[in-house]
């Protein structure tokens, strides 16, 4: 079978945007995130809030090339950028004083991608 990639038009647009920003800024992190988002849905990252809590500290910035799910609890303030958030995950992140943002917003804030943790 021929590999077609994601069929969601918004995801395809995001992947093109990530590749463009990677070339413009000369930063490989955005190309890596684009590659991870391009994988089949069943191989895409699904990260629980508890994992974010376990592997980050106060003030970290995390990018999830997939979905953030609401299992567990978050005990410190972090900025989380992802393709999708569940409602409970968004609620738990904001209640902890953090932010749940889109990947595009993260690129606008930090075009060089410095200090960003990729979590899968």
Swiss-Prot record:
One GO cellular component term noted in the UniProt record for this chain: cytosolic large ribosomal subunit
GO MF annotation list: RNA binding; structural constituent of ribosome
Keyword DNA repair assigned: no
Any one GO BP annotation for this protein: translation
Keyword Secreted: no
Alphabetized PROSITE patterns for the sequence: RIBOSOMAL_L18E
Family in the record: Belongs to the eukaryotic ribosomal protein eL18 family.
Protein name: Large ribosomal subunit protein eL18
């Amino acid at each position: 079978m021929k590999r077609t990639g994601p069929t969601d038009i918004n995801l395809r647009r995001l992947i093109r945007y990530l590749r463009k920003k990677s070339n413009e800024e000369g930063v490989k992190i955005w190309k890596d995130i684009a590659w991870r988002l391009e994988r089949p849905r069943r191989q895409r990252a699904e990260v629980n809030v508890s994992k974010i809590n376990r592997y980050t500290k106060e003030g970290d910035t995390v990018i999830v090339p997939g979905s953030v799910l609401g299992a567990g609890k978050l005990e410190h303030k972090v900025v989380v950028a992802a393709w999708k958030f569940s409602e409970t995950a968004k609620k738990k992140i904001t209640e902890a004083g953090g932010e749940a943002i889109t990947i595009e917003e993260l690129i606008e804030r930090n075009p060089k991608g410095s200090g960003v943790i990729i979590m899968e």
